[in-house]
Design a protein with these regions (language model features):
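Structural motif
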Residues: 1-5
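PLD/PLD-like phosphodiesterase catalytic module centered on the HKD motif
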Residues: 7-184
């Protein structure tokens, strides 16, 4: 799910509920003090970000968007079971924020069962999510003083990185099962 502004309390309550549903959230900026979604380990959050000079060696130069005042996220859509045989794509002008739900003149389309459209939206969501998640992790680790480039995010030995992908309680295992299971 994408959020261009704030995350309304209705969505916060749903996202904070502990369950086994894997959910990815990408938002234009970090969570505000009034926003809380981090109670469930199956909610993976990424905030839009711009890495300054030297933040990541050997990456392409970052460029901002001079046209739009939303610095990182402009698309607004929600995907429910996007890899299933009956996906749900919700998209339109609404930001899923309180004003967009209650007072603004917004529109939304709900597309159900169109696997081609869901695949296209899911591909775009994962592209945007991965782009910002990497930057978000760099920012969080730097803020926590854990920005040692020798610490190694990628492990060389299979035995060092593979086990979490097969631990049923692990996010990595849930993600592996979701992306590799046959459509339902």
């Amino acid at each position: 799910m994408t959020f261009a502004f704030n995350i309304d309390t209705v969505f916060q309550q749903v996202l904070s509920a502990d369950n086994d549903v894997l959910r990815h959230i990408v938002k234009d900026d970090p969570l505000g003090e009034e926003e809380s979604i981090a109670h469930d380990r199956d909610v993976i959050f990424a905030a839009g970000g711009y890495l300054g000079e030297g933040a990541l060696a050997n990456f392409l130069t970052e460029r901002s968007n001079p046209v739009n005042r939303n610095r990182y996220i402009h698309n607004k859509f929600m995907l429910v079971d996007p890899l299933s045989d009956d996906p749900l794509v919700i998209t339109g002008s609404a930001n899923f924020s309180r004003p967009s739900q209650r007072t603004n003149d917004e529109n939304m389309l709900i597309l159900r069962g169109n696997t081609r459209v869901a695949d296209i939206y899911f591909g775009e969501f994962m592209r945007v999510f991965d782009h910002h998640y990497a930057r978000y992790l760099v920012r969080v680790l730097t803020d926590e003083g854990r920005s040692d480039p020798e610490a190694g995010y990628l492990k060389e030995n299979t035995s060092d990185w593979l086990p979490p992908h097969f631990n049923p309680a692990s996010y990595k295992s849930k993600r592996r099962r979701y992306f590799t299971s046959p459509k339902k």
